[in-house]
């Protein structure tokens, strides 16, 4: 059908598709630019730094206490398998960005299930944070339309890590860190910068990491299958959920047009 033959509904449909496609292209370009910038700026290899820290811990024959912020059970699976060999861990589930609240509760149950079933050399404890969704929405004001992976996400990192640092200080933990760097979509450089800055504020050491290295993400998918964990298809917040739904709808419309 030529463009002149389109009716109003078809034009509107095409317009929606163009908006979503342009939004995704813009996001992809921004992500590539950010990755290149981070590669140029990143002087630290966080995995190597973590290796050195663990070597030091082993040589001192200590078992430090680690306060580990977890975004979800699947992401924490590899991190717990890896770090429970060297640390006594408390998993801190604090994610006020999650939408809806039923999703928040579902992810808590999956986290508790994993902790019960995962073998660990040292004890793994669990602590659930409050569902402070109003804090997330206050933080996100004015950033609602920014694609996933931008400034809104960076502020969300800090919101969650700050709460982890606060509890780590109160509980007199040796270290705190987060599972977030295991995701290919999360900015490890930014996470570690925020973590180290908060360490200075709260007086608790931040355990630097880039858990996606050494096939960490791949191992998390394997462990998720082994333990039958629910793996969500969006980060957690309503904005990432809406973005995934728009992308899904676009794919379905394109597949439908090809078939017809």
Predicted regions located by residue number:
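Short, positively charged and aromatic/hydrophobic N-terminal segments
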Residues: 19, 27-37
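Nucleotide-activated chemistry modules centered on ATP-dependent adenylation/adenylyltransferase
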Residues: 33-260
């Amino acid at each position: 059908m030529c463009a002149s033959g389109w009716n109003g509904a078809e034009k509107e449909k095409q317009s929606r598709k163009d908006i979503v496609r342009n939004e995704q292209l813009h996001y992809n370009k921004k992500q590539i630019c950010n990755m290149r910038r981070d590669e140029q700026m990143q002087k630290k290899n966080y995995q190597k730094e973590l290796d050195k820290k663990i070597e030091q811990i082993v040589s001192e024959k200590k078992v430090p206490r680690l306060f580990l912020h977890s975004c979800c059970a699947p992401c924490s699976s590899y991190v717990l398998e890896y770090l429970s060999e060297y640390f006594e861990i408390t998993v801190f589930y604090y994610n006020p960005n999650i939408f809806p609240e039923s999703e928040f509760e579902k992810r808590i149950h999956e986290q508790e299930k994993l902790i019960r079933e995962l073998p660990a050399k040292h004890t793994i404890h669990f602590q659930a944070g409050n569902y402070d969704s109003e804090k997330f929405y206050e933080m996100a004001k004015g950033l609602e339309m920014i694609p996933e992976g931008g400034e809104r996400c960076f502020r969300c990192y800090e919101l969650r890590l700050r709460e982890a640092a606060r509890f780590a200080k109160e509980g007199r933990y040796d270290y705190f860190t987060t599972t977030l760097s295991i995701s290919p979509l999360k900015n490890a450089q930014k996470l570690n910068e925020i973590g180290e800055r908060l360490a200075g504020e709260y007086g608790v050491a931040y355990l630097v990491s880039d858990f996606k290295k050494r096939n960490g993400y791949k191992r998390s998918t394997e462990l998720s299958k082994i333990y039958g964990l629910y793996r969500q298809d969006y980060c957690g917040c309503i904005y990432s959920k809406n973005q995934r739904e728009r992308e899904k709808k676009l794919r379905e419309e394109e597949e439908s047009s090809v078939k017809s």
